[in-house]
């Protein structure tokens, strides 16, 4: 299931439906091939939308203290709960893409934290000079 989250479920549902309908082997092969072509197209669209969302999520800056705290918690949960769950369900490309984007942004802001000796860069999710009130 390396192509995406729903590919395996869709193909298995089609296989089960074809076996229940008792169609010929030739028709069955043709339907399965058509479904695989459709899932590849669906996965390309899903990858694009997912990667745009993850980049937006990685770069988003909340305005309130509660929002900033929630974003940090969500990013940690995504990295330590959701990404391993994706790897476990064999969605390797999704998991790797999410982990690389979020860790890349974290390390980019962490570099500025180390350089200027303040945690505000990670808290505010910015890389420009940042001063807390």
From Swiss-Prot:
This is Non-structural protein 4a. Residues 1-21 form the signal peptide. Its main location: host cell. It is a multi-pass membrane protein. The chain crosses the membrane at residues 40-60, 69-89, 91-111. Belongs to the coronaviruses NS4a protein family. Pfam families: Corona_NS3b. InterPro entries: a/bCoV_VIROPORIN_3A-like_TM (IPR046445), Coronavirus_Orf3a/b (IPR004293). Residues 34-124 form the CoV 3a-like viroporin TM domain. GO terms for cellular component: host cell membrane; membrane. It is found in: Host membrane. Keywords: Host membrane, Membrane, Signal, Transmembrane, Transmembrane helix.
């Amino acid at each position: 299931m390396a192509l995406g989250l729903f590919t395996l479920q869709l193909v298995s549902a089609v296989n089960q439906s074809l076996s229940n309908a008792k169609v010929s082997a030739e028709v069955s092969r043709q339907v399965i091939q058509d479904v695989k072509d459709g899932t590849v197209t669906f996965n390309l669209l899903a990858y694009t939308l997912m990667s745009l969302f993850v980049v937006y999520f990685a770069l988003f800056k909340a305005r309130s203290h509660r929002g900033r705290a929630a974003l940090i918690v969500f990013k940690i949960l995504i990295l330590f709960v959701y990404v391993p769950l994706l790897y476990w369900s064999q969605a390797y490309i999704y998991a790797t893409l999410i982990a690389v984007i979020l860790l890349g942004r974290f390390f980019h802001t962490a570099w500025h934290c180390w350089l200027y000796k303040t945690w505000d860069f990670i808290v505010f999710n910015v890389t420009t000079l940042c001063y807390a009130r």
